[in-house]
Swiss-Prot record:
Protein name, entry field: Maturase K
GO CC list: chloroplast
Subcellular location: Plastid, Chloroplast
Domain of life: Eukaryota
Pfam families the UniProt entry points to: Intron_maturas2 (PF01348), MatK_N (PF01824)
Molecular functions (GO terms): RNA binding
Signal peptide positions on this chain: none
Known role: Usually encoded in the trnK tRNA gene intron. Probably assists in splicing its own and other chloroplast group II introns.
UniProt keyword list: Chloroplast, mRNA processing, Plastid, RNA-binding, tRNA processing
Family designation: Belongs to the intron maturase 2 family. MatK subfamily.
Length: 513
């Protein structure tokens, strides 16, 4: 009981920063101004169609809403500057946009304060390293070698918009703010697909709809909060058979207290969720749950997650969305890498005096490779090659200068190598580089109405240097020009970078136009 209350208080402690009543005052501009961490420029809100609104406009609009004459004029003159007229195109594209984005700025303030409260400056680089996407792969490499089963999860969706508001009620104590949130959700009823479709959730980031992104992150945060709580409580069940019954009663009492807040959810005992080695990772609406337990234990966790979504989020989760695989016999797609834990057999001959014998050693290794087919499909969708991987020119870029074309192709190639530097096999990456290099040459040749061979002879080594990665440039400085050096063997080792904070656009085809 005390442990649960202490765990909940850590989450509730953030409520002291929630100042939502200020949303209905003109002082919102001061908070939004400080939120931008820039004392000279106000916060810019990027809305639909790439329109930018200053937070100063939010302040002026809220002041205007408080003016009684404005509301009277809106009623007496419905065709003149009516705020709540949904048929008014200017309202749809401007007033509602800056109000919803301004609301999102305010509700993000408590979360930003938590992130900015770093204890010391010397710990900031370490915190930034943990933000890197590549930082999770060394963790998987260290932990997955000792695990047996892997579950592929999908965050429950679609989620009803009213449930999103109810989830925020536990954190937001300001009733008018919740009413305003419901107003935005009702107005954006045609945006319902942004929450109810995972494909649209990725497009949500592209549209930069801050309000809906905040709602989705809050929903996922609540989902993981209860999952983490139950995982931590299950660790106390590692007892012998003689003491299981007493601990089971003690644990059920905790669940009864927990059921006061959410009645009707924990009606079944969950004493069988005993797994001290369980790891959870999530990205893009998907998650993986790995453990060292038996297959029966994983099936029970699967049943629990299905009931969890049904009782708490009022969502019927199909059991097919949770797949259970054995780590040594399968591979999984994670953040653009095809990862697996194969068992490598090593035969060692041991000589002892006059006797010799062979030792068969089996070792696990966390392996990451680059999937060729999805990346070639992304390049094909971006019009760099055909569906079979044959390079083609990109006519849209022929109006650019030669150096701009070279820079764009070279930057895409270097970013691909940089992001997939952790692959144990670089053959796919060199194939992608060949596609981009030849596509660049054909684009330049098409612009100058020349042949590819003629244009490559004209540029010479300058054309090739644009496609060198940072590692290849270092290796090229170590050898003279007369030395024949192959870069294919220099990248046999995997390299993880701690400065990658976003996934490559070509890795996620949904981000491409």
């Amino acid at each position: 009981m005390e442990k649960f209350e202490g765990y909940s208080e850590k989450q509730k402690s953030r409520q002291q920063y929630f100042v939502y009543p200020l949303l209905f005052q003109e002082y919102i501009y001061a908070f939004a101004h400080d939120y931008g961490l820039n004392g000279s420029e106000p916060v810019e809100i990027i809305g639909c169609n790439n329109k930018k609104f200053s937070s100063l406009l939010v302040k002026r609009l809220i002041i205007r809403m408080y003016q009684q004459n404005f509301w009277i004029n809106s009623v007496n003159h419905p065709n003149q500057d009516r705020l709540l007229d949904h048929s008014n195109y200017f309202y749809s594209e401007f007033y509602s946009q800056i109000l919803s984005e301004g609301f999102a700025i305010v509700v993000e303030i408590p979360f930003s304060l938590g992130e900015l409260s770093c204890p010391e400056e010397k710990e900031i680089p370490k915190f930034q390293n943990l933000q890197s996407i590549h930082s999770i792969f060394p963790f998987l490499e260290d932990k997955f070698l000792h695990l047996h089963y892997l579950s592929h999860l999908e965050i429950p969706y679609p989620i009803h918009l009213e449930i999103l508001v109810q989830l925020l009620e536990y954190r937001i104590q300001d009733v008018p703010s919740l009413h305003l949130l419901r107003f935005f959700l009702n107005y954006y009823s045609n945006w319902n697909s942004l929450i109810t479709s995972m494909k649209s959730i990725f497009l949500l980031k592209k549209e930069n709809k801050r309000l809906f992104r905040f709602l989705y992150n809050s929903y996922v945060s609540e989902y993981e909060f209860f999952l983490l709580f139950l995982r931590k409580q299950s660790s106390c069940l590692r007892l012998t058979s003689s003491g299981t019954f007493l601990e089971r009663i003690h644990f059920s009492r905790k669940m009864e207290h927990f059921g006061v807040m959410y009645p009707g959810f924990f009606r079944k005992t969950i004493w069988f969720f005993m797994d001290p080695l369980m790891h959870y990772a999530r990205y893009q609406g998907k998650a993986i749950l790995a453990s060292k337990g038996t297959l029966l234990l994983k099936k029970k966790w699967k049943s629990y997650l299905v009931n969890f979504s049904q009782y708490f989020f009022s969502f019927w989760t199909q059991p097919q969305r949770i797949r259970i695989n054995q780590l040594t016999n399968s591979c999984f797609d994670f953040l653009g890498y095809l990862s697996s834990v194969p068992i490598n057999t090593l035969l060692v001959r041991n000589q002892m005096l006059e006797n010799s014998f062979l030792i068969d050693t089996r070792m696990k290794k966390f392996d990451t490779t680059v999937p060729a087919t999805p990346l070639i499909g992304s390049l094909s969708k971006a019009q760099f090659c055909t569906g079979s991987g044959h390079p083609i020119s990109k006519p849209v870029w022929t109006d650019l200068s030669d150096w701009d074309i070279l820079d764009r192709f070279g930057r895409i190639s270097r970013n691909l190598f940089h992001y997939h530097s952790g692959s144990s096999k670089k053959r796919t990456l060199y194939r992608l580089k060949y596609i981009l290099r030849l596509s660049c040459a054909r684009t330049l040749a098409r612009k100058h109405k020349s042949t590819v061979r003629t244009f490559m002879q004209r540029l010479g080594s300058v054309f090739l240097e644009e496609f060198f990665t940072e590692e290849e440039q270092v290796f090229s400085l170590m050898f003279t020009k007369t030395t024949h050096f192959s870069f294919h063997g220099s990248h046999s080792e995997r390299i993880w970078y701690l400065d990658i904070i976003r996934i490559n656009d070509l890795v996620n085809p949904l981000t491409l136009n």
